[in-house]
Amino acid sequence: MILKRTLTTFENQNLKRCKIDSEIEYGRKKGEIIVYKKRQRATVDQPCSKEPELLTSSSSSLTSKEESQQVCSDQSKSSRGRVRAVPSRFKDSIVGTWKSSRRKGESTESSHDDDDVSLGKKVKGFSGSSKLHRSKDSKVFPRKDNGDSSEVDCDYWDVQISYDDANFGMPKKSDASRKGVYKPEEFTVGDLVWAKCGKRFPAWPAVVIDPISQAPDGVLKHCVPGAICVMFFGYSKDGTQRDYAWVRQGMVYPFTEFMDKFQDQTNLFNYKASEFNKALEEAVLAENGNFGDAEIISPDSSATESDQDYGPASRFQGSYHEDIRTCDGCGSVMPLKSLKRTKDSQPEELLCKHCSKLRKSNQYCGICKRIWHPSDDGDWVCCDGCDVWVHAECDNITNERFKELEHNNYYCPDCKVQHELTPTILEEQNSVFKSTEKTTETGLPDAITVVCNGMEGTYIRKFHAIECKCGSCGSRKQSPSEWERHTGCRAKKWKYSVRVKDTMLPLEKWIAEFSTYTLETQMLDKQKMLSLLEEKYEPVRAKWTTERCAVCRWVEDWEENKMIICNRCQVAVHQECYGVSKSQDLTSWVCRACETPDIERDCCLCPVKGGALKPSDVEGLWVHVTCAWFRPEVGFLNHENMEPAVGLFKIPANSFLKVCTICKQTHGSCVHCCKCATHFHAMCASRAGYNMELHCLEKNGVQRTRKSVYCSFHRKPDPDSVVVVHTPSGVFGSRNLLQNQYGRAKGSRLVLTKKMKLPGFQTQTQAEQSRVFDSLSAARCRIYSRSNTKIDLEAISHRLKGPSHHSLSAIENLNSFKASFSFRAPFMSVFCFLGATFSEYLRKILISIYLVTHQEADFTSFRERLKHLQRTENFRVCFGKSGIHGWGLFARKSIQEGEMIIEYRGVKVRRSVADLREANYRSQGKDCYLFKISEEIVIDATDSGNIARLINHSCMPNCYARIVSMGDGEDNRIVLIAKTNVAAGEELTYDYLFEVDESEEIKVPCLCKAPNCRKFMN
């Protein structure tokens, strides 16, 4: 084996041993043999001897015996004067001195060493006449402008190279390397190095590799910026795989120069010395050119003289099959089966898997068609016409022009020829346009024909929208980006993909050159807005329930922020959400739209009818409070009264042309999702359960509110969703508000018993429950076990009446007038007398006259409505055996959604008294019925109250409770309202809304058996 120190890459050289008796005899005395390499003559016009800065010239004759002895004696002694000997494991090798070439490349003391250095060092070059380029930011790999790069010896150099080009391929010694710290830039692919994985890890022999073509995918995924990829010699502990690493500055050292320092390491970090010795021997063989199992295929591996004629693949014909080819993209050598031909590539072009992916993603130069490689340096420019990247050098872009392109448009040569938009023509057009801007503005066409992806459309300058001519869109107007997607174009750049049909000029250029007016900066006026609202639409008629606030959709209310209900349209809102003063009489309150019932009010921002409407500063235009909240340009002049709404004319006009994804209509102004371009009306999103958030923050001493709406794709809609408020103190929603503000939540009823079992809890069988009693014991002394035979039966309603042969609906029709007139004694007595004495025909006539003359009039206040509810409650509800727990409340007749059912009555006590009563009821084993209506007032219906206390809890209720204020200093009342349509005989339930408690000890189990049961009421 012959070991050369000056090789920086893997190289197979034909070395010839010099047979000089005197030199060999002297070397044997020192334990060394000096090998001389026969010098070859240069065969090019400018030999390497003419580059004194690059390569040291060598002598053509051998030195004398005395000179060689002096050189060898200087090299064989260390700084202490000791004679260096070859390690025992290299006794069968022909080895020179370890440090004979450490700094000899820079000195000219020995002519023999100069010969070794001059012939051993290599420079990076090209087989063509291209000039080498390398930027300062290059980490590991040199710049390659084509795929024919190779490493050649100076003796076979066939290209004229300058001084800078020659130094490019050689690692430059920096100040840091002189101090023992080497940068990754100083090493190239194929260099043998000592690499360390950490400060406490040993230095291990390794080779620098190309991570793209030589490293596994797992190594490439964990790429570290500013580091080089190395492959360690030797095998891992399983003995089958190689180890790879990304090494940074200070953890990599030249192999030859640090051989003496690292070959005698003792701390190998759990590695065996035998493994280290095998790796070292493998590295020594690799430096000599004998790779063995460690041979790797490198795109930058050196080419021999024969390789220049037959290509890189000819080097592997001896050990590989004949179907080995090189990738035309990166130059990697691999089997032909793993190479692919892409649709966009040339017929004879073969690409590897990695390069084919880059080709499909347009990661290649549009001029030279060279695929982008991580090792490539230089500048790239993206064409604004076709979205293709181009080498700056390929288009002869200077550094000054490259800086100017950051603020200007760039077009590749193909786009320049196709559209004739050279920079000089653009400058002339801009100059002409500036001079004639005022004269051409008035003569602009209102519409122009545009084309994209083979589909035509009409661009309307007034609305900055495009009307498609495909036939299926009709008269629908779309924004340029939407129409671009509609045509099937994937460029996502409508400014350049949408072009004017006549001149094929990009639409953005046409707008910039012939119009200074865009719709984004256009200010609307009343006439234009009314013209946008004149189009026909289908009104969305919504059911406004009193369960939730029509603005924030919360179900909770508080003493200082009560839920109020309009006496006419039955719309429920919070006082703060609608701007209602606390001094107003809430029993006869009507909303702003119902103050003038003869005039119909509609929102100008959405097609939804009714709701919480507020007037704007424009006469005749009204808006929903929710629409004004989530429209950034709209606000309220008075935040306390929440009116009037201002900023309607600041809304972009193109928002009135968007199609709502929920109601499928264009009437009104649409908002879009904060994550994508999905458009919808704010009120439609609120009714559909979309996630809506208000972010309140303070910036520079100014209170700011940011609104966010999420579409159904980015957040799953929920019918019970509410407006979530984000503040610096926390996030407030419908359920977690109970955790953040104790004592301010809506009142709830607590029902507890001693023997509560979790749903699904399996009790013992009767065989296990049966006890073995003494045969002589009395029956009254035995423990009584309750029978469970009727637990799973359906709910049964109890009606106080005798036997009946008629259906329930027939009986309800006969007694319907009683519910309307509720025990009016004079009329009822007359009716009974007439029914007993007159004929049936006269009886029906009198009943009809009575119903017509005594119809239920509209209530002027909530107090009157509540009195009527108390008189007729026995005709609406009854009690019965519940299928949930104990006794329950049942509907005696069919009840419509939103209809008031019954008032929850009891004794009003303070909070402290209610706590004492609850403890007393528990000690007696009684069920307690407590309903909290405010922070200090609780209604106790345990001993005194009406039938409403029997209503049970359900996670899917058909009723909800509403706390209403009577005004004039009177106490609040609790009313149960139907949430859905309830059939006669159906059990009435509502959600208790207990305060959420995380402790398992005081959890109250839920027995409702609903599909969405929460298992616990709290």
UniProtKB/Swiss-Prot annotation:
Q: Where is this region: Disordered?
A: 39-150
Q: Ranges for the Post-SET domain?
A: 1002-1018
One of its GO biological process terms is: methylation
Q: Where is the SET domain positioned along the sequence?
A: 875-993
Q: Can you say where in the cell this protein is located?
A: Nucleus
Q: What class of enzyme is it?
A: transferase
Report which reactions are catalysed by this protein.
Answer: L-lysyl-[histone] + S-adenosyl-L-methionine = N(6)-methyl-L-lysyl-[histone] + S-adenosyl-L-homocysteine + H(+)
* CC annotations in GO: Set1C/COMPASS complex
Start-end of Polar residues biased regions: 69-78
Which keywords annotate this record?
Chromatin regulator, Metal-binding, Methyltransferase, Nucleus, Repeat, S-adenosyl-L-methionine, Transferase, Zinc, Zinc-finger
Looking up InterPro entries in the UniProt record yields:
ATX3/4/5_ePHD (IPR041955), ATX3/4/5_PHD (IPR042011), EPHD (IPR034732), Hist-Lys_N-MeTrfase_ATX (IPR025780), Histone_Mod_Regulator (IPR050701), Post-SET_dom (IPR003616), PWWP_dom (IPR000313), SAND-like_dom_sf (IPR010919)
Q: Where Zn(2+) is bound, by residue? A: C955, C1006, C1008, C1013
Where in the sequence does UniProt note compositional bias of the Basic and acidic residues kind? 135-147
What range(s) does the PWWP domain occupy?
Answer: 189-258
Q: What function does the entry list?
A: Histone methyltransferase.
Protein name according to UniProt? Histone-lysine N-methyltransferase ATX3
Q: Which gene encodes it?
A: ATX3
